Amino acid sequence: MGPRLSVWLLLLFAALLLHEERSRAAAKGDCGGSGCGKCDCHGVKGQKGERGLPGLQGVIGFPGMQGPEGPHGPPGQKGDAGEPGLPGTKGTRGPPGAAGYPGNPGLPGIPGQDGPPGPPGIPGCNGTKGERGPLGPPGLPGFSGNPGPPGLPGMKGDPGEILGHVPGTLLKGERGFPGIPGMPGSPGLPGLQGPVGPPGFTGPPGPPGPPGPPGEKGQMGSSFQGPKGDKGEQGVSGPPGVPGQAQVKEKGDFAPTGEKGQKGEPGFPGVPGYGEKGEPGKQGPRGKPGKDGEKGERGSPGIPGDSGYPGLPGRQGPQGEKGEAGLPGPPGTVIGTMPLGEKGDRGYPGAPGLRGEPGPKGFPGTPGQPGPPGFPTPGQAGAPGFPGERGEKGDQGFPGVSLPGPSGRDGAPGPPGPPGPPGQPGHTNGIVECQPGPPGDQGPPGTPGQPGLTGEVGQKGQKGESCLACDTEGLRGPPGPQGPPGEIGFPGQPGAKGDRGLPGRDGLEGLPGPQGSPGLIGQPGAKGEPGEIFFDMRLKGDKGDPGFPGQPGMPGRAGTPGRDGHPGLPGPKGSPGSIGLKGERGPPGGVGFPGSRGDIGPPGPPGVGPIGPVGEKGQAGFPGGPGSPGLPGPKGEAGKVVPLPGPPGAAGLPGSPGFPGPQGDRGFPGTPGRPGIPGEKGAVGQPGIGFPGLPGPKGVDGLPGEIGRPGSPGRPGFNGLPGNPGPQGQKGEPGIGLPGLKGQPGLPGIPGTPGEKGSIGGPGVPGEQGLTGPPGLQGIRGDPGPPGVQGPAGPPGVPGIGPPGAMGPPGGQGPPGSSGPPGIKGEKGFPGFPGLDMPGPKGDKGSQGLPGLTGQSGLPGLPGQQGTPGVPGFPGSKGEMGVMGTPGQPGSPGPAGTPGLPGEKGDHGLPGSSGPRGDPGFKGDKGDVGLPGMPGSMEHVDMGSMKGQKGDQGEKGQIGPTGDKGSRGDPGTPGVPGKDGQAGHPGQPGPKGDPGLSGTPGSPGLPGPKGSVGGMGLPGSPGEKGVPGIPGSQGVPGSPGEKGAKGEKGQSGLPGIGIPGRPGDKGDQGLAGFPGSPGEKGEKGSAGTPGMPGSPGPRGSPGNIGHPGSPGLPGEKGDKGLPGLDGVPGVKGEAGLPGTPGPTGPAGQKGEPGSDGIPGSAGEKGEQGVPGRGFPGFPGSKGDKGSKGEVGFPGLAGSPGIPGVKGEQGFMGPPGPQGQPGLPGTPGHPVEGPKGDRGPQGQPGLPGHPGPMGPPGFPGINGPKGDKGNQGWPGAPGVPGPKGDPGFQGMPGIGGSPGITGSKGDMGLPGVPGFQGQKGLPGLQGVKGDQGDQGVPGPKGLQGPPGPPGPYDVIKGEPGLPGPEGPPGLKGLQGPPGPKGQQGVTGSVGLPGPPGVPGFDGAPGQKGETGPFGPPGPRGFPGPPGPDGLPGSMGPPGTPSVDHGFLVTRHSQTTDDPLCPPGTKILYHGYSLLYVQGNERAHGQDLGTAGSCLRKFSTMPFLFCNINNVCNFASRNDYSYWLSTPEPMPMSMAPISGDNIRPFISRCAVCEAPAMVMAVHSQTIQIPQCPNGWSSLWIGYSFVMHTSAGAEGSGQALASPGSCLEEFRSAPFIECHGRGTCNYYANAYSFWLATIERSEMFKKPTPSTLKAGELRTHVSRCQVCMRRT
């Protein structure tokens, strides 16, 4: 049994081996033919073997593994030999996705905090000591010192010539200062007896009437001594005589005195007789200012300052790039003739200097301006003036107390009243020599009585009875009441020159006199020596860069004396002048009795008294105060504040003579210069209206302080109160010195005298619209405009002189007159300050600029929603074309806000170094760069061939409502289109929303602190060029801010009753009042100090601008360079205060397109573009509205494909619904755009010759009327002065007409038309465009009528001593205009000054012409499809659905059941059968049909039958192939069986669709668009064919959805066998449509091998589309 069993087992083993071998052979495909009979035979044996194997087969099978030794099967075909395929297997886990699309550019980072100021630069070497600087400008007047003790008596003056001197008569000296009222003197000697007058009508003595005004002055007596005539009646006061010439007058001839008149009535107690020269009296009040003295000697040089750090001497280098303004360098060594530096800013006012010695006596000054009336406080009584002319007889005095005087002599004097006004000197009565009487006892000073009402002039009293027995003195009567001040007497003969009185205390600052004619320009002063610069942070440097315009500076040194201006109005009567007998000042004597009537003395100072009778009609007075504001008058000259000239730098190479510069505005107040040579005396003006106030004493001029050392720039001080106007200084010589650190703007000085009008400057580069500054000081009065239409009735004028009539009721306000013709064009103002090199922050919306040239039409934008009309702006400059970004989603326009109030003025950036004065602007600033779309994936892009064909132009979208006008961006040069990136998600909301509707404008608040510079928002993509918006309706005028501190003057009251009191002591300087709310819009305010520079925005290739280095020494002036390029716009600053509209600069040439800027996020939607000029595209046919199917379940989102080729542009869809405004995005990080490197900014060229005069700007709107000044004393009208600074901003003028339409932008490149794109999500609200520049100013309003006269009875106290310098006050209100300077002699033209600091950035020039189109960039790849749009609004109900029975099968290629696409219904789910192979023949299923989705899975889903009615299942070497999932093969590569197969088999769904379904293939990596009228079901990869065992397989119809698999896999199917196993085998191939470029269609294909990770880059994309129903 054993051997037999062994044999059996051996046979069995052999059979098994044979079966195994054959099975292997069969598995490996050895049986190539269809008739493998041997195989069948062996197979039979094999079956027997199987039945005989229970359990043993596996054991035996292991030896069978030696099969590889047999050479039968080619080793690589089936999986056993596939070990090297392991990496491939890993590949099936999913190849790496295509490179992700680049993310959106990050938002720009939030700008960092302002850094602290950098440390000061390293000090340079010490320079050699410069030459002596020019004399510094006189310091501000020191505070008045306390009055010094009376000086010693001066030398006695030379006696004047006495012509016609009556022998024996003494000439009177000039009037001394009034002494303290003496005690009543003892009665004088009796006067000579007068002749007996005719008896008067005796009336009962009435109560004493108030003193009447003095009667009119009598005629001057003839000039020879005639016989004594009867006493004449008092003559009528003549008008003030014309002032004599202002030469130093010799004493006049003494006119012979007329005969003595009859004896007058007893006078008031006369002045004390001349005693010995008394002790000097107390210091009287300061007399009127004398005429300006001759120019003083040049002061001794100041103490040289410490040496500054020397600068390194610079050679003339090539023009370097312009650095940012560095810290001030030390002074350089002056080698040869260096160019003169600019004169520094005013230093801080020095401490008051010590009171200097009195200078030599100057020529008589021109009469000072009347001080404002002092407040009545009891002053000390002045010494009696000369006796006035004899007045007419007053009312009868009180009856004397039985004092018959002896024989007509004076009655016994009553107790002395308070001193009367000075009488005219009496005639000498032939007394050969008047001996001075003894001084009377000093009377107690009376307090001033209340002023009585002005009485009528009494009739002449009766002549007193002659007193026969009047030899003895009568009893001393009680003191009479104080008489009224006497009339001004005729001018007496000039007395002998008295000693110089002590200077009085400073008087109050007088009201501004009328503006004199402009003096001729003075000759240039001698050249000063350069000052030294001391680096001391606390001291203000000499001139830094020009500060922002400060308050008008103090007047410069006096020019050579100009001709006399027109006669000013007579000042108010001053305090008694200081004409005394020459000699030492005695102590005031007591009041003597009145002497006999002396000769007519020189005119006493004007007395203060009641108004006399109405004189003859005077010449026309000055205009009264402003009337009610009329329509705005013509625009005055634009005033500019010119900084004080710094010391001139070293002489530069002489430039060619420029055109005459424009007249500068007032500079900072200079310290008062030395008095100029006296001008001629002006004619006497008309008497003013109203009671003259008492003049305040004139203040003493302080000595000039030493020049302060340059300080480091301090923080800007508060604006000080305006100082007193100084006299016009002489022009200093240019100093030689280096510019100091830029100081802070000094405290506003006293308004200087206005400079002459400058010649018209060349147009500066237009700055960005500045904000309106606070009102400047009242400028010089502008030229009279043409008469306006009759304005509304003014308020009642001040009552004329005379008894006030009954006040009529004020008339009602008349209607405003119609608009007058535009005023005469003002002269061009100075060019603005040079701008910074670095562009400042972008301002808020500028005012409307002039209309740009019309750009060519851009492509039509999507219609925006109707915005509210914006304020009419001028069209901005045309921007250059930005990089062509991927079109952003259309944003809905936000609601347009009404224009907000002007924002606060942003800080100025650091001043740039001096730029040259440019010719009229070259190209304008580059517009903001739009955000480029996300860059597409640029892998494997042939940049040369990327650009696609130009498509047809899309249909013109509907014109949307006009959105707010965006600023027109300058077009960038077209960038190379990147591949279209994936549509990004909607960007973060732009930083700035549209302004909401503004409420009614609130009162303007005080300016807030300057905010730090905001972060740079993402630049929006440039909107398409909007149609210029319709000019908005005129905004509601803001409600006027509260008036500033000073209210308008009220209507003049009736003249007060009473004599104006004496001047009170000067009150202490009041604290600065709280700032009023800002008045109506003022002139452009002075620029703030530059803020710390904002962080520079990211810029293109050039690095950020470094911190400013220390400035080098000034190089020699280079030749004029070309204008530097515009700087990159800085971060947008806060809005500055609105400036008044400057004159419009000439249009710049159209700029070249700028380079691209930083890509930002999508900007706000641009306004409606001008319709494009492209040809209209063909309209797509509209599909019929089908019946609506049921909504299917949403499919799973496919993974994004590789970016497809950009499809043709579809027709423009209708505007999407308005999206909600997004939240503000965080600032993105700058993304480097395609912008080429921008060269560094060139050095600014030297100033070009002034360009031709630009066309006149449109007249600005008149500013509001400034506060009324105090009523000036009316004078005769002066010659019209130079045009004043602009007044305060008037009410808004009548709305300007719309700006000229901007030039049409160049035509954009036509877009590439594609298929109709799917509707994207509504874009987020873009950033609101900048407000257009300010509209064209309206026509000039009519000139307002003069305001009502100010009150004329304000009595001003004397100034107190100045307190210590307080902290700078808030900026004061606009001071009244200073007096008009006298016409100076025209100076010779000075050397050209050094180049100014660069002005502020001009407004962008007008848009340059569009550059030629660049060559078209290569066509970008189309971006991947955007995410699905938001669901559309609900459509109309469809027609009832009909089951059409169209089936589509969708394969998930995962283990999840797929969802049917939207619009289809699920019928069932199953497993994805690809094809089956039986009997070595394959038959495939169309994956798009239901046959490919079997509801059940089996590795052998079929059986085979023969004609013998025998069927076999799972009995042969047959296969089934199923779509597989990404499940990776097991590492062992062993076949998978059982339930482990489940994860490998794809699931499918059969869906019923309402319409035909088909697949479209792009044969590119772009996803094709569905044809019009078809909608997308899914996108995928174009699967064509597959083969596996025996090279059998099948394919897909490309029109079938089965040819578009949603997942690409190199092995998309798995092979399963009847024996229950599945696996991937190396002979399985999948075939996919490849990508074909158009240019490669008829060329030999280039072989290539793609590895994992790049497979998808050459597989065609497809989309399954369903016809819309």
Curated annotation (Swiss-Prot):
<keyword id="KW-1015">Disulfide bond</keyword>
<feature type="compositionally biased region" description="Pro residues">
    <location>
        <begin position="413"/>
        <end position="424"/>
    </location>
</feature>
<feature type="compositionally biased region" description="Gly residues">
    <location>
        <begin position="803"/>
        <end position="817"/>
    </location>
</feature>
<comment type="function">
    <text>Type IV collagen is the major structural component of glomerular basement membranes (GBM), forming a 'chicken-wire' meshwork together with laminins, proteoglycans and entactin/nidogen.</text>
</comment>
<feature type="compositionally biased region" description="Low complexity">
    <location>
        <begin position="611"/>
        <end position="620"/>
    </location>
</feature>
<feature type="compositionally biased region" description="Gly residues">
    <location>
        <begin position="586"/>
        <end position="595"/>
    </location>
</feature>
<feature type="compositionally biased region" description="Pro residues">
    <location>
        <begin position="436"/>
        <end position="448"/>
    </location>
</feature>
<feature type="compositionally biased region" description="Basic and acidic residues">
    <location>
        <begin position="497"/>
        <end position="508"/>
    </location>
</feature>
<feature type="modified residue" description="4-hydroxyproline">
    <location>
        <position position="603"/>
    </location>
</feature>
<feature type="modified residue" description="4-hydroxyproline">
    <location>
        <position position="623"/>
    </location>
</feature>
<feature type="compositionally biased region" description="Low complexity">
    <location>
        <begin position="1333"/>
        <end position="1343"/>
    </location>
</feature>
<feature type="modified residue" description="4-hydroxyproline">
    <location>
        <position position="606"/>
    </location>
</feature>
<feature type="compositionally biased region" description="Pro residues">
    <location>
        <begin position="367"/>
        <end position="376"/>
    </location>
</feature>
<feature type="disulfide bond" description="Or C-1570 with C-1662">
    <location>
        <begin position="1570"/>
        <end position="1665"/>
    </location>
</feature>
<dbReference type="GO" id="GO:0030855">
    <property type="term" value="P:epithelial cell differentiation"/>
</dbReference>
<dbReference type="GO" id="GO:0007420">
    <property type="term" value="P:brain development"/>
</dbReference>
<keyword id="KW-0037">Angiogenesis</keyword>
<protein>
    <recommendedName>
        <fullName>Collagen alpha-1(IV) chain</fullName>
    </recommendedName>
</protein>
<dbReference type="GO" id="GO:0061304">
    <property type="term" value="P:retinal blood vessel morphogenesis"/>
</dbReference>
<feature type="cross-link" description="S-Lysyl-methionine sulfilimine (Lys-Met) (interchain with M-1533)">
    <location>
        <position position="1651"/>
    </location>
</feature>
<feature type="region of interest" description="Triple-helical region">
    <location>
        <begin position="173"/>
        <end position="1440"/>
    </location>
</feature>
<dbReference type="InterPro" id="IPR016187">
    <property type="entry name" value="CTDL_fold"/>
</dbReference>
<keyword id="KW-0677">Repeat</keyword>
<feature type="glycosylation site" description="N-linked (GlcNAc...) asparagine">
    <location>
        <position position="126"/>
    </location>
</feature>
<dbReference type="GO" id="GO:0001569">
    <property type="term" value="P:branching involved in blood vessel morphogenesis"/>
</dbReference>
<feature type="compositionally biased region" description="Low complexity">
    <location>
        <begin position="377"/>
        <end position="387"/>
    </location>
</feature>
<feature type="compositionally biased region" description="Basic and acidic residues">
    <location>
        <begin position="289"/>
        <end position="298"/>
    </location>
</feature>
<feature type="compositionally biased region" description="Gly residues">
    <location>
        <begin position="758"/>
        <end position="767"/>
    </location>
</feature>
<dbReference type="GO" id="GO:0062023">
    <property type="term" value="C:collagen-containing extracellular matrix"/>
</dbReference>
<feature type="modified residue" description="4-hydroxyproline">
    <location>
        <position position="629"/>
    </location>
</feature>
<feature type="compositionally biased region" description="Basic and acidic residues">
    <location>
        <begin position="535"/>
        <end position="545"/>
    </location>
</feature>
<dbReference type="GO" id="GO:0005576">
    <property type="term" value="C:extracellular region"/>
</dbReference>
<feature type="compositionally biased region" description="Low complexity">
    <location>
        <begin position="847"/>
        <end position="875"/>
    </location>
</feature>
<feature type="modified residue" description="3-hydroxyproline">
    <location>
        <position position="647"/>
    </location>
</feature>
<keyword id="KW-0964">Secreted</keyword>
<keyword id="KW-0325">Glycoprotein</keyword>
<keyword id="KW-0379">Hydroxylation</keyword>
<feature type="modified residue" description="3-hydroxyproline">
    <location>
        <position position="204"/>
    </location>
</feature>
<feature type="compositionally biased region" description="Low complexity">
    <location>
        <begin position="715"/>
        <end position="731"/>
    </location>
</feature>
<keyword id="KW-0176">Collagen</keyword>
<comment type="subunit">
    <text>There are six type IV collagen isoforms, alpha 1(IV)-alpha 6(IV), each of which can form a triple helix structure with 2 other chains to generate type IV collagen network. Interacts with EFEMP2.</text>
</comment>
<feature type="compositionally biased region" description="Low complexity">
    <location>
        <begin position="485"/>
        <end position="494"/>
    </location>
</feature>
